[in-house]
């Protein structure tokens, strides 16, 4: 039997191949990084080069779901559009029904449940995306969650998805400390440093968004990102000089 063709049939060794293939699609997507700070959440995405005549504003990997929640994704953009639209409708429906915005976990659970349903029904295929979902709850607590094509979700302090996820995650495991997220600027720099592990041409290929407590999503413009990149490069040079002095 061809187990890799049927979505709802397990292989003898317990695999759902269509779900695993969807996870492979995620690994080919642009790298996305999320970091939860003290009073800020930051999303960063590797920005692929666009055609000369293409309007780059139409190629967005970070989007708001509600005033207090946003997400970045890696994988198939067309699949992400469906998930984003469904999540936005759910956020609005929740506001109308309960008269309160959604919690970050609520909308993450909704997205994860939507993905899971597409792994268990005929005539559909799994969504080929992973998502990093960030935001603030009513009490001002910052949150970061990650979902994958199988419908599982987890809370994180910092995480990465996409083609460079492994090396970026290793960087974050080494460098994520209480000191590294002490201020908003330090948290933003941590995300940029993590992305620079896989992005070759500096700040021009990075898309960055920040959300602060009681403030809506802000997409940083290229000049702001370049300013942070220049500061990071300067810090690197100073550290190298200090090392050379110690060695001599």
UniProtKB/Swiss-Prot annotation:
GO terms for biological process: proteasome-mediated ubiquitin-dependent protein catabolic process. Glycans are attached at residue 130. It is found in: Cytoplasm; Nucleus. Its main location: cytoplasm. It comes from the Eukaryota. GO terms for molecular function: identical protein binding. The keyword Magnesium does not apply. This is Proteasome subunit alpha type-7. It comes from Homo sapiens. The gene is PSMA7.
């Amino acid at each position: 039997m061809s187990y890799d063709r049927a979505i709802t049939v397990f292989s003898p060794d317990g695999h759902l191949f269509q779900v695993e293939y969807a996870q492979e699609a995620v690994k080919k997507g642009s790298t996305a990084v999320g970091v939860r700070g003290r009073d800020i959440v930051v999303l960063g995405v590797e920005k692929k080069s666009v055609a000369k005549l293409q309007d780059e504003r139409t190629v967005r990997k970070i989007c708001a779901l509600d005033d207090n929640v946003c997400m970045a994704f890696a994988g198939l953009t067309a699949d992400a559009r469906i998930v984003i639209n469904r999540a936005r409708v759910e956020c609005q429906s929740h506001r109308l029904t309960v008269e309160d915005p959604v919690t970050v976990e609520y909308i993450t659970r909704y997205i994860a449940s939507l993905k899971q349903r597409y792994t268990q029904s005929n005539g559909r295929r799994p969504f080929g995306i992973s998502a990093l979902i960030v935001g603030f709850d009513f009490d001002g607590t910052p949150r970061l969650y990650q979902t994958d094509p199988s419908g599982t979700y987890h809370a994180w302090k910092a995480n990465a998805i996409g083609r460079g996820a492994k090396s970026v995650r290793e960087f974050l495991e080494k460098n994520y400390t209480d000191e590294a997220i002490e201020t908003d600027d330090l948290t933003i720099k941590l995300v940029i440093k993590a992305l620079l592990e896989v992005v070759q041409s500096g700040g021009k290929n990075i898309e960055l968004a920040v959300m602060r407590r009681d403030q809506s999503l802000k997409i940083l413009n290229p000049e702001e990102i370049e300013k942070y990149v220049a500061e990071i490069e300067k810090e690197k040079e100073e550290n190298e000089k200090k090392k050379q002095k110690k060695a001599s």
